[in-house]
Amino acid sequence: MARIAGVNIPTNKRVLIALQYIHGIGQKNAAEILEKVKIADDKRVNQLSDQEVLQIREVIDRDYMVEGDLRRETGMNIKRLMDLGCYRGLRHRRGLPVRGQRTHTNARTRKGPAKSIAGKKK
């Protein structure tokens, strides 16, 4: 099992798919990485040489923000919005949808389970 960017990527999958197990690398970025390193995207992880794994690791470390660094930056961006007190920051602080969705009904994922109200029986 190859370890890239602190993540054990599965050995029996294609490299294009396996790279997507790393937080911050999707389909497009995985294809870009393989193109830079000149590895066929239909090759499996267990067929990679140690040199190829090392090249992939170097490209990711040099050109992409992944895993902990990406999570930290995302968290810092949200914290910055909350500290500014702007509308988006207030929505984050209150645990409500940030991007203009309705909240009269729905928004249960963001708001959590429905709270029952006493005296609403018919």
Curated annotation (Swiss-Prot):
The gene is rpsM. GO terms for cellular component: cytosol; small ribosomal subunit. It holds the Pfam family Ribosomal_S13. InterPro entries: Rbsml_uS13_C (IPR027437), Ribosomal_uS13 (IPR001892), Ribosomal_uS13-like_H2TH (IPR010979), Ribosomal_uS13_bac-type (IPR019980), Ribosomal_uS13_CS (IPR018269). Belongs to the universal ribosomal protein uS13 family. Keywords: Ribonucleoprotein, Ribosomal protein, RNA-binding, rRNA-binding, tRNA-binding. One of its GO terms (molecular function) is tRNA binding. Located at the top of the head of the 30S subunit, it contacts several helices of the 16S rRNA. In the 70S ribosome it contacts the 23S rRNA (bridge B1a) and protein L5 of the 50S subunit (bridge B1b), connecting the 2 subunits; these bridges are implicated in subunit movement. Contacts the tRNAs in the A and P-sites. Gene3D superfamilies: 1.10.8.50, 30s ribosomal protein s13, domain 2. The keyword Ribosomal protein applies. This is Small ribosomal subunit protein uS13. Signal peptide: none annotated. GO terms for biological process: translation. Residues 95-122 are annotated as: Disordered. Part of the 30S ribosomal subunit. Forms a loose heterodimer with protein S19. Forms two bridges to the 50S subunit in the 70S ribosome. Disulfide bonds: none annotated. It comes from Rhodopseudomonas palustris (strain BisB18).
